[in-house]
Amino acid sequence: MNKRKRTRSRLDIVYTILDFLRLILITVVAAVVILVFVARKEEVKGTSMYPTLQEGESVIINMAANYVGDIKRFDVVVAREYRSDDLWVKRVIGLPGETISYREGVLYIDGNKVAEPFLDKSYVEQVKSRTNTKYFTQDYTSEKLGRDEYLLVGDNRNESLDSRNEAVGPFKREQIIARGVFVYKPFSKARYVGNGG
């Protein structure tokens, strides 16, 4: 009888260890799936989205959100630039079928004036003063965007290579791989950056 209890006790220990190992395996597989298909860690390079995102900040890109709902104006998105295969974080200004223009620093969509509430007003004034320019965003007019095209622009207009540049142009929907980013480093500035409208 005593021998049977010891054998059962050993089996209980083995089953407990196996359950623990199974839990670890499931956790590792789930983490790999999340990191490959749902989220991705990146570091902000450059100042094209300053002050919204700052150079050197570490972010988690939310690729899953890309498959839920439509891309909206002023969403912050991550897009793959075809020429370099680099990932660019930009803001959606123009949607398919629209004509976008900036005149005297003001955004117009299909001829209608549209406010850009996400722009940091103090930074805009600082840049205009430093560069001795009247407008934060220089004049620009797009062709009518195609049915699958988006005009992506950096928040730091004078420092951003984006859709306004003829060499870049509009981005296709298939190039947009994620919507929204979560800044996690430095921890003191942790925040979600998504829709600015």
What annotation goes with each model-predicted range?
Residues 2-16, 51, 55-197:
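Soluble "head" domains of membrane/secretory-pathway proteins
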Residues 19-37:
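Hydrophobic membrane-insertion alpha-helices, especially the h-region
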Residues 20-26, 42-46, 144-147:
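Short, functional N-terminal and low-complexity linear motifs
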Residues 28-31, 47-48, 167-169:
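Intrinsically disordered, low-complexity boundary segments flanking structured domains
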Residues 33-49:
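Aromatic-capped interface at the extracytoplasmic side
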